[in-house]
Amino acid sequence: IDCGISPERISFGNTIKKASDVKYAYDKGIRLFVTDAQADLEQIAQYAPNSRVFVRVLVESGSTSDWPLSRKFGCDTQMAIDLMVKAKQMGLQPYGVSFHVGSQQNNVTVWRTALKTAKAVFEKLEKEHGIQLELINAGGGFPAQYLAEIDSIQDYAKRIQCYMDDLFQHKVTLFLE
């Protein structure tokens, strides 16, 4: 915000946060928060009412990332669904799904697998609860060139966009970090 970024464009993307941080962000105009736990969701509802929330799901990164982060934060798909239903009941706006495939991920197809997990959450929420999500935060994980030759970030982005086009028939906003 101090750098001139509009608060409407900022996502509070950490699943571990203090109530005072949620309140501070909300008071500054931030209205998009990630969650992966009931207690955190309750905190968001209390200190950031009517905000949009997205849920971080656990995904497998396999052995193709140098630093697996896919299981460090997040919840399973059923808990993600339950949290989004609860969010709606608490006056929050269920908005999307987040995941991280691990840092220095060398296999672009891992994003496809993670996007399939996100799609399962999207579909079940819409079919069983009438909740239509709008966002996927696919985290980071893009490899940087060190010693080994790697595909360019543009190549990764093109493949991920193809996966999105294949899996999601309606408009979904995609965040990549």
Predicted segments — roles?
Residues 71, 150-165, 173-176:
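Active-site loop ensemble at the mouth of alpha/beta enzyme cores that anchors a bound cofactor
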Residues 1-135, 159, 163, 170:
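Active-site-proximal beta-alpha core segment in soluble small-molecule metabolic enzymes
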Residues 14, 176-177:
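Short loop/edge segments at beta-strand edges and connector loops
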Residues 101-102, 136-146, 176:
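Glycine-rich beta-strand-to-loop/alpha-helix junction loops that act as flexible
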Residues 108-109, 146-151:
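Metal-dependent catalytic neighborhoods of phosphoester/phosphodiester hydrolases
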